[in-house]
């Protein structure tokens, strides 16, 4: 099965579903979505039960989530737990985290580069110079672009 993204434009009165190329099963699916504007975004996820396998776990939309296309894979194997957009970079930069590390893309998910190879659970940015990734055992890592 393929993971789906649900969208509403009327505050939850009605919903539409869009199929993504990200596989979905009891151990996997979409974990996070990030948008740079109202039409362009990335959905990420994967199967947490396959931590050592590269997975088709990134999808791109350029029509507000109506359709999704397979994007490139991050440098690390396993699922992606979170994704966010770095504000104020000029060109869109997404940062993704998972048990394989922290990666970023500056071309809407086509190619990825590694920032760290340690396990992380979540990531967020207040500005291009104030981002944090968090992981097990109290790990907090500051990230700047």
Features from the language model and the residues they span:
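Residue-level hotspots at or immediately adjacent to binding/recognition sites across diverse folds
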Residues: 1-145
């Amino acid at each position: 099965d393929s993971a789906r993204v649900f969208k509403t434009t009327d505050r939850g009165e009605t919903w539409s579903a869009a199929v993504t190329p990200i596989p979905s099963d009891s151990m996997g699916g979409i974990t996070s979505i990030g948008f740079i504007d109202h039409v362009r975004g990335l959905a990420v996820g994967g199967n947490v039960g396959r931590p050592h396998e590269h997975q088709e776990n990134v999808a791109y939309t350029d029509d507000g989530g109506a359709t999704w296309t397979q994007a490139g894979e991050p440098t690390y194997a396993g699922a992606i737990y979170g994704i966010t957009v770095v504000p104020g970079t000029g060109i869109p930069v997404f940062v993704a985290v998972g048990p394989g590390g922290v990666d970023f893309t500056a071309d809407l998910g086509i190619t990825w580069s590694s920032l760290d190879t340690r396990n992380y659970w979540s990531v967020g940015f207040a500005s291009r110079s104030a981002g944090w990734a968090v992981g097990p055992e109290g790990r907090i890592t500051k990230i700047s672009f």
